[in-house]
Every structure is written in C-alpha cells, then in structure tokens.
A protein has these predicted regions:
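Acidic, polar ligand-binding/catalytic clefts
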Residues: 59, 63, 67, 72-137, ...
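Extended ligand-binding regions for polar small-molecule ligands
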Residues: 60-68, 136, 142, 147-150, ...
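Ligand-binding clefts/hinges and TM-proximal coupling segments of bilobed small-molecule sensing domains
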Residues: 22-23, 150-163, 201-206, 232-258
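Alpha-to-beta junction loops
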Residues: 34-35, 71-72, 88-97, 177-185, ...
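Periplasmic-binding protein-like
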Residues: 40, 117-124, 187, 191-235, ...
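Short helix-initiation/N-cap motifs at beta->coil->alpha
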Residues: 75-85, 130, 148, 163-177, ...
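A ligand-binding cleft/hinge motif common to bilobed small-molecule-binding domains
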Residues: 85, 99-107, 154-157, 172, ...
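Short glycine-rich His-centered loop
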Residues: 32-55
C-alpha cells in the first residue's frame, strides 16, 4: 500500500512540475533566463578564447539577442550529434550553432528564426591531393564529417564514405593524417582556419557557387509566439547594425546578408 501511495505521489509531482514549467514565450515575457545549446569547439562561431571565455559569432549574436529580449542567457555546451536531440528533449530552449535545417525531418520537428549569417561550402584536402576537381569527384573517397551535419549530408549525397567525427578540428586532423581524403565545411569556418594557419597542409579543392539558406536560432515546433518575438529581435539587431558589427569583428565583413 505504501509503495502504491509513493508511486501515486511521484506521478502527481511529475505532472505538477510539468504543468508549472513555463514555456519559452513565458520566460521571454517574464524576463527570465533562456538556455542555448552550442558546441563551444567550432571557431569562429562558438569556441573558447585564450582566457577560456565562451565566445564566437553565434555566441555573441545569442548574447545580443538576449539583451534585445531583456532576458538572461545560459549556454549549454554539447556535441553537434546530440544537440538537436537535447533541444527536442527540453534540455535547452534554442540552438545557436550555424544551423540551417536542411532536411525535411528536421523541418518537421523544429522552427528557425530569421537568419543571422550566410555562408557557402568549401572542400578542404591535403595539398598533395590531385584527384578532386569537383564535388562529384568525391564518390568513393573518405569524407571526414559529422554524420548529422549539413556537410555530412552533402558528402553522403555524392556517395563519399563518411568518416564520422565530432568536430571540424578532428576532421582536419584525420585529413592531415591521411585517414580521410577530404572534409566539407562552412566557407566562413574554413577561410578563418586558413587565415589563422598560414602553414597548414591543406588547400581548397572545391567551393560552392551559392550560399546556404542562412544560419538561424532553432527552437522546437509549436512555439509561434516565442518565434515571433525572436524574429522581431533579430530584425532589430540587423536594423541597428549589431550583426554587421559582429560580422566585421569575427570575419572582417558583414555576413548577415545573403
């Protein structure tokens, strides 16, 4: 009897907590704290500086968004492969990590804000690699990419063998060690890497002619009122020149326009 009563009270407690949990919209309206998922190992978008502080273009845009909304912000660092799962489970309210929502499955589960940056795709290979002149040439070759990323999807589309990695840094290491033949990533990330590593063993083998659909803040579906407030805040950041300033800080140019 005591066991049954305990289980009953446990269930009641769970549902009471569930019902009392505020929505993202309510937290914004009440000027509370919003939580943001990000990698923390993907420069120049999300990384730790020499002082150990979490920073990067996406991180600083998220901080400016919080200021614009009048809320506090808390970051949760997690690997890309489980980031959207963490969002779906409610571990955090949104994701700021160069997300474009390119697949129908993701589009069915999540919504994205107005874009805050645009980028193309670059393929990086070793300087002694001469087999690749076009994206179609990667068929059968080893692509070091995160399985669930946009770039992993591109490599899979063109029949490359995916060598699973957790980060761009790991991908570059595998290519340098000849354990992979290539890696695909954001043109902004690749150009930043090459600019800060003048003597790297890599070269650009291919670059997309078009930019992506834009990176955005991503939230769970069915939060239209919260999304509207976020979109309004992003638009104000654009209008005030905040995104332009951050783009110039991290990339030397405005990346908020297609």
């Amino acid at each position: 009897m005591k066991k049954v009563l305990f289980l009953f009270l446990l269930v009641i407690s769970f549902f009471r907590g569930f019902l009392n949990a505020s929505s993202l919209y309510e937290r914004i309206i009440n000027k509370e704290t919003i939580s943001v998922g990000t990698e923390g190992i993907y420069p120049p978008f999300t990384y730790h500086n020499k002082e150990g502080k979490l920073t990067g273009y996406d991180v600083e845009v998220a901080r400016e968004l919080a200021k614009e909304l009048g809320v506090k912000i808390k970051f949760h660092e997690t690997s890309w492969d489980i980031m959207l799962t963490g969002l779906k489970s409610g571990r955090f309210d949104m994701v700021a990590n160069q997300v474009s929502l390119t697949t129908k499955k993701r589009q069915a589960a999540f919504d994205k804000s107005l874009p805050y940056s645009y980028s193309g795709t670059i393929m990086l290979v070793r300087k002694d690699e001469n087999r690749i002149k076009d994206i179609k040439d990667i068929k059968g070759l080893r692509a070091a990419n995160t399985l669930s990323s946009t770039y992993g999807e591109i490599a899979f589309k063109y029949d490359a063998q995916i060598v699973s990695v957790d980060s761009m840094a790991q991908a570059l290491l595998l290519v340098a060690q000849k354990r992979a033949d290539l890696t695909l990533n954001s043109s902004l990330a690749i150009l930043n890497y090459l600019n800060t590593h003048k003597n790297s063993p890599f070269k650009i083998a291919w670059e997309s002619k078009e930019k992506d659909g834009g990176a955005s803040f991503v939230i769970n579906k069915h939060q239209e009122k919260a999304l509207e407030l976020i979109n309004q805040a992003v638009q104000r950041l654009i209008n005030k020149g905040v995104l332009k300033r951050l783009g110039e800080q991290f990339f030397g140019k405005d990346v908020s326009q297609p």
